[in-house]
C-alpha cells in the first residue's frame, strides 16, 4: 500500500517515488506550502506550479496571436 501512495505522489509532483512515506509526505507538504504566488493558492498539476487561470489566459493569447492570423491567411 505504501508503494502505491509513493507512485501517486510521483505522478502528482514529478519527484522520484520514495520508500520513506514520512519523507515523501514532508516533501509534498513543502512543495504545497511554497506554491503560492500572485496572492492566490497555486495548484499542482503534473509537477508544475500553475495559477488557476494562467492556462486559460495563455491559451487565449496563443489563439489570438498565432492561430487566428494563420487561419485568416489560409482562406
Curated annotation (Swiss-Prot):
A Gene Ontology biological process noted in the UniProt record is: one-carbon metabolic process
- The name under which this protein is listed is Tetrahydromethanopterin S-methyltransferase subunit F
- Additional note from the record: Unlike other orthologs, MtrF from M.kandleri is not located in the mtr operon.
Quaternary structure, per UniProt, is: The complex is composed of 8 subunits; MtrA, MtrB, MtrC, MtrD, MtrE, MtrF, MtrG and MtrH.
Which pathway features in its UniProt record? Answer: One-carbon metabolism; methanogenesis from CO(2); methyl-coenzyme M from 5,10-methylene-5,6,7,8-tetrahydromethanopterin: step 2/2
Q: How does it sit in the membrane?
A: Single-pass membrane protein
Q: Does the keyword Cell membrane apply?
A: yes
Report the enzyme's class at the first EC level. Answer: translocase
User: Gene of origin?
Assistant: mtrF
Report disulfide bridges, numbered on this chain: none
